Each structure stands twice: as C-alpha cells, then as structure tokens.
C-alpha cells in the first residue's frame, strides 16, 4: 500500500509539474511564436512584445508592450497591457467565464495607402479561402446553434486608448481618442459571478467629447449597475466613410445624424434571481441620405426607435415604437440591373459568386433550426413614404409611383397564440389602396380586408405591351377580404374593370364598358369557389383574319413559350390525388355585346357583324346532374336570334328553345362568296325549335327538333350572275340527332319555285341541282334534270324524308323524278361527309 501511495504521489507531482510548466512556459512561448513569427509574416511587419505571462493556478494571463510598426508613421498598433483573469467556472459550465478583462494603452493608427490597401486585399482573399474550406463546419455549427452562445465576461476595463483611421484617397480622417470604458459584465448566462463596477464610457470623437454616465445600486433586493449613454446629432456619414462597403459609387452614406438616449442595466444574480443584461431607451436618425453615383436613392428625414427592453440573457426584445417618417426610395431598373440590388450587394461586401451559393446551401439549415428569441413590436409605423419605380429597359420607360404611403403595425410578436393588427394605405396607379387586418408571424396567418379605388392600368401599360404585343387601358376597383393560413388561402369580395380597351397600334381589338366579379368565396383548402356574379357590359370584339392568321393569335402566341414550360412541369403526387374543385356561378351575363369579323384573306374581303349580344346564365355549377338556365339573344343579319332553356356541365346537357327570325343572308354574302364561291342578293332565314345536348357512353349527342325556312332566296356566283332563286324553301318537322348512325327525319320539305314558263322552271331546278353538284365536284345531276321532259311544278314537295342506311328517301317520290334525283344527290353528298358509300340511291315508299 505504501508503494501505491508513493507512486500516486509521484504521479500527481509529475502531473502538477507538467501543468505548471505548460502554464508558465508553453503559453507564453506559444504567444510569442504566434505574434512575433506568424503575425509578423502575415502582416509583413516586425511584431515586438515586451512580456507575456500566464499563471496556471490563478488563470491570469498578461501581455505587455505589444507593438506593430508602420513605415513613416506612428505604430499601426500599440498595447501597453492586456490582462485576462479566467474563472474556474469555465470548466463546470462548459462555457467561457472571465472574471476580469483589462485593456490599457491600446492605440490603433490605421493609415490606408496603396501598400496597406494591397495588404488588406491579400488578407481578405486568404480569409475568403478559409471561409470556403470551413463551410461544412460552419453549416453544422449553424444547425446546432439556436441562439446566442453561452459566455460571461466580468469587470471589463478599457483605458487610455484611441483609434484613428486615415485614407487620403477617400479624404477620410477620423479619430476616436481618450477612450475609457468600464462595464460590470457582458453575459448571456443566467448566473456566474457578481460585479460592483460602476459602468463608464467616455471618449472624444474628432475632438468632440462624448460621455455616458454610470451609477451603481449595491443595496436592496438586487445588485444593479446602470450606464446612460446620450449622444446628439452625431455625424454618422463621416463614420460610415470608414467602411468601404458604405463608401463606394454604388452605395454611399452622404448624410445621417444619430441621436440616442440609451440605458444599459447590469443586474447581478441575487436572491435566486438570474443575472440580467438589459438595454432600453430611444435612438433616432435624422436627414439620412444614401446616394448611388451621386444621385439619391434613399432619403429618410426621420427615424425613431423606442426600445422598451432588450434582454440578452433571456433573449427577449420588446420594441415600444418604431417610426419612419418621409421615407423616399428611388428604384431604377436598367440594362445594368436594379440600382437598389447593386447597393445591397455593395453593402454586403461585393458580388462574389461563392457567397450567394454558400448562403443558398446554408439556407435550409438555418430555416430548420428554431430560434429561441422572443420578441414583440408594440407599435411600428411608416408615414408619408414615397417609392418611385422607373424601368428604362422598356420603351417607353415604365414609371410607377407609390405616394403618401402610410403603414402601421400594433402588437406584432413571436407569440403563436397572439395576432397583431396592421393597416396600410397609399396612392397607387392614379388611385388609392387601403388594407387592414390582423397578422401572425409563426405560424404565418393573415386576415385582411383590402380596397382599391380609381386605379388605372396606364402606368403599367409598357409591361402589358411587352407581354402581349398590344396596349391595354382600363380602370380597376376592388373590395376584397382574404385569409391566409400557411399555404391555404380564402377570399371573397368584388372586383371591377371599367373602360377597358385592347389595342394593337391604332386598331382596337376589344373593348368593354364594365366587367364585374362578385365572389362569395374561394377556398384553396376546401378546393371550392362560389361566384355570385360575373358580368360584362357592352363588349365589342373586332376579329380580323389575314393571310398570317387571326389578329388575336398574336396575343395568345406571346405567352406560348412560358405556357409550354408550365405545362411541361409534372404535377406532384399531392396535386394528382387531390379532389377536384367544386364551383358554382349564381349568375353570369353579357349585355349589349357586338362581334365584328373581317376576313382580309379572301377576295373580295368579307365582313360580318353580330350586334345586340345578350347572354345570361344562372345557377351553373360543377355538381353532378345540376342544370342551370341560359338566356341568349342577338341581332343577326338584320333579324334576331333567341335561345332559352337549361344547361349543365357535369355531364354536358342542354334543353334549349331556339327561335331565329328574319335573319338575312345578304350581310354575309361577302363571306359566302369568299368561302364557297356563292353569294346572296337576298334571302331570309327563320328557325323555330328545340336543341338538346345529352351524354351517352362518354359521348355528347346533339339534337334538333323544329322547323327551318329560307325565303326570297337569290344566290349568285362570284361575278354576281344569278344561280338560282326561290320564293321559299322550308323543312317542317326536322329531327336530327348525332347518334351512330345519324338520325334525320323531315316531316315535310317544300321548295316554292317562281312562277315561270316550263323551260325557265327546268333551268331553275337545274340551277338547284347545279348548286349541289358544284359543291361536291360533280355535274351529271344537272344534265339529267335538263334532259327531263316532264313538266316541273312550281312547288316541289317531299314528305316524310328520312336518312337511313346511308340514303335519303321520301314518300311518293320515284328515283326518276326530279325529287328523286335531288334526294340521290343529297345521299351521295351525305355519305361522303360521313365517310360512307357514295353509291347510295333514293327509294320510294
């Protein structure tokens, strides 16, 4: 046992000796090696050191007489004394705890000349390389950390110190002298030690004395020290010139005055209460001016911050009030980019590509870690702000101004159970917008009402012209309510477009007086939409067909590329499995519309116009089997066309009564001549019946049951020569269904010929047959009729006409008669259209 104890004692003695040797010898030696060799080599200057010591038993480290020379000037750096007294609590708390830090006689004399500038760039370059190599480690550290690191530093003292910076090229000469700073502690730990040091701060800035008064409260329930810091109209612009990122052509702080009245509270841990380091007070900036290439991009006459409390230990912040008054932003976009982005890049220290990439990669890690900071903004406001946007990449340049912008936030916080309120108003696009509501940051939730009046698209017309290749002008108004919870959104309200015009050059493509949308609700979570009203008043559409296509195709084609790219993106599994949207429209209407069509691709040019278009649809929805009502009317060819009935979407179904009255063919003669080579001097079309749509075996079947008639017809060829005419042709009891095979029945077909001689009658009938023949490319039918010697009656009547088995038939009509020949011709034409046999013949029943 004695030997064991002796061995243990010897081992302990050796360990103590090694520890003492490491402390007394190794630490000073390592310090000298780093400063006198490594730092000297990096800076290209001989670093000297008078003395350095470390007591391993008291953990006191002292460095004396550190000097870094500067050619032709005072030393770059001199430090008379650095004393650091570490606490043994560092080992138990696994975080640095420093009992005392004393800095005496620190003098930094930075002179920026060409040589020093190159040295700085070289050192920064090495620093950038080091940052890249340590990127993975930094990312892991970012993931692990969730707030401020744990540390505590007590009894801080800085005396007899100064800092000067001179750059003759930039005309900078700043000096901070006679610096004295005493702080009881700076800590993010609840408790570690106590300090009764009275806080103090005093220095001269360019000869102007600045002081902060301190006090100590050593008795009572708390041991507390305070430091009150006051400054009035400090020229921040002069100080900002020292920072290269804030003193370049892209970004320069031209003017700013800082005033502060801040109180630092250092509360020692007593009576079981944790240590606190608190900051409160007011700070303001006045006459802020930020320029880019000598032009102001940001001006801020006044900014005020009233900080209720900032607790670095509990990591809690309460802002009583933040006010920005008279903010002006001049944002410009040119071929070189957006000026504010260039300024932001300059403020960030450059535009190196590696840095954004590193930030992009680290972003997910940062977002994945929840910050422990809690905060609250009791009130914040933006008053009388103006933002101007000029985009010179367009011709003409786009100019948009947000004027008289007022915004306020109240009781916004990190508390997930409490929502704050906000309001915003501004003059925009020639009108005014207003919004107010409640907001919650985490998780994101917003409930707001927004209203816009007398807004105009004129200011954004250059963007619309670039996107569509056409000019759009319109007025806008809206009054909506919206709720946002995470990725789900719901909205309701009204929106109106008025005095809308769409022009290409001097030609108006479309216009309308008013378009209104009244939305009861749309909910992305429920995937439902309930529309109360969609209305379009006095729309006019001017469609023009040319050899290069219809005029509207250019507008559709302008977004084809982006549309194709969008369609090419595969839908996610969630989207594919999501239920279909349900929707309903209480009423949709078009009133007093006009459709004008002009075809310049044919000769002669053909035109047509459909005026007095009116359409009303009610109670249309996606519900299976539901039917809404439809009511349509329009002028057509000097007459009218009306339709009314029921219509459904799922499945497609319709039962609509149709009536066409006195619809003239002459207004469409130009188009008829251009498309078919046949025009019309006269002709009136009438129709009365019922149209139906029904779904059968995933196919939509269309049907018609009613009467058709064509009166006072006079057809001509392209040269104006008459082809045929009749008093009246009618189909009574016409039934058609697009089944397979097609169902077609005519109870009675009549053609009332003009009162003429037999030869003339034969020619008229031959003309009818010739018309059919010319449309199908065959002429023998006309020859057969011309050879027919039987007297042709003035009126041709066919009863019970049917189309069955690929051929037409009628009661009492022989194949050799004029009626039979016409039916045979129609059978051939119908068979060719339906892809059937062309050898069909008529039969007599």
Language-model features and meaning:
Residues 53-117, 141-166, 195-200, 263-282, ...:
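Flexible beta-edge/linker motif
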Residues 1-43, 222-227, 457, 798, ...:
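N-terminal type II signal-anchor transmembrane helix
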Residues 130-246, 359-459, 464, 568-667, ...:
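Elongated, acidic membrane-bridging lipid-handling scaffolds
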Residues 121-131, 342-354, 553-565, 772-775:
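Surface-exposed loop/turn segments flanking beta-strands in extracellular/periplasmic regions
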Residues 42-46, 72-86, 170-182, 204-213, ...:
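Amphipathic hydrophobic-ligand
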Residues 47-51:
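A short linear hydrophobic-aromatic micro-motif
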Residues 115-122, 245, 299-300, 337-342, ...:
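Flexible, surface-exposed loop regions and adjacent strand-edge segments
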